[in-house]
Amino acid sequence: MANHETIFDQLKKQIPVDEEEPLILNRDSSVGLVIVDVVNGFCTIGSGNMAPTKHNEQISKMVEESAKLAREFCDRKWPVLAFIDSHHPDIPERPYPPHCIIGTEESELVPALKWLESEDCATLRRKDCINGFVGSMESDGSNVFVDWVKEKQIKVIVVVGICTDICVFDFVATALSARNHGVLSPVEDVVVYSRGCATFDLPLHVAKDIKGAQAHPQELMHHVGLYMAKGRGAQVVSKISFET
């Protein structure tokens, strides 16, 4: 019998992402939700250089799960922080092509999350770099994200968004380092909700025809992003439930 196991299947066996038990949240959880870059420029078909060119199931599911989770949090008046990728046209973010330029529709929340703009529980933070922690820094040395954590007394941070292996991972890794360094009190845990994350797809055969592009197979890089986040100390879960 032929062996139809793919290289990806073999990789998952070598670097498995052993997910934690389902995360159960209640009014005593002291939890905050961080949504990373769920904007048109990464999620809405045809909305720029980094957006999908056709329906993408992983990205669509991520948007759906992120919106659902945000609604659950806001209904309970729990804090939500949404990072919004926003770049100046004269400051490129290499190696990526121009994307999410300030003042364009690319740099706006997707329609499914646009309602967050009028929610009292939501803090929106535009950032001009991959790492939301760094993008939260102000010229006076303060940090919007750190201040949000301290003001809301957040012990558990739940993270969703795009891209799993880039902006999500960079933020998670830095938040964990800050926690370990004692500058993110009272945070105890950072939880990555796998079904609420996604990354972009650039297969090798397509990347070969784009000067300077690196191949970025979606399923593989999503898995690697989750694996790396767990290796840094994050909890990775595929199910979140709420106690009444």
Curated annotation (Swiss-Prot):
**Is Plastid a UniProt keyword of this protein?**
no
Q: Which InterPro entries match?
A: Isochorismatase-like_dom (IPR000868), Isochorismatase-like_sf (IPR036380), NIC1 (IPR044717)
- Pathway terms, separated by semicolons: Cofactor biosynthesis; nicotinate biosynthesis; nicotinate from nicotinamide: step 1/1
Enzyme Commission code: 3.5.1.19
Query: What UniProt keywords apply to this chain's record, in alphabetical order?
Result: Hydrolase, Pyridine nucleotide biosynthesis
Q: Name one Pfam family in it.
A: Isochorismatase
Q: Which SUPFAM superfamilies match?
A: Isochorismatase-like hydrolases
**pH-dependent activity:** Optimum pH is 6.5-7.0.
Spell out the molecular function terms from Gene Ontology.
nicotinamidase activity
Q: Which GO terms describe its biological process?
A: pyridine nucleotide salvage; response to abscisic acid
Catalyses: nicotinamide + H2O = nicotinate + NH4(+)
Tissue-level expression reads:
Expressed in roots and stems, and at lower levels in flowers, siliques and leaves.
Q: Phenotype on deletion?
A: No visible phenotype under normal growth conditions, but mutant plants have decreased endogenous levels of NAD and NADP and display abnormal hypersensitivity to exogenous treatment with abscisic acid (ABA) and sodium chloride (NaCl).
Top-level lineage group: Eukaryota
The family line of this record is:
Belongs to the isochorismatase family.
Q: What does this protein do?
A: Catalyzes the deamidation of nicotinamide, an early step in the NAD(+) salvage pathway. Prevents the accumulation of intracellular nicotinamide, a known inhibitor of poly(ADP-ribose) polymerases (PARP enzymes).
Question: What name does the UniProt record give this protein?
Answer: Nicotinamidase 1
User: Which organism was this protein described from?
Assistant: Arabidopsis thaliana
Recorded name of the encoding gene: NIC1
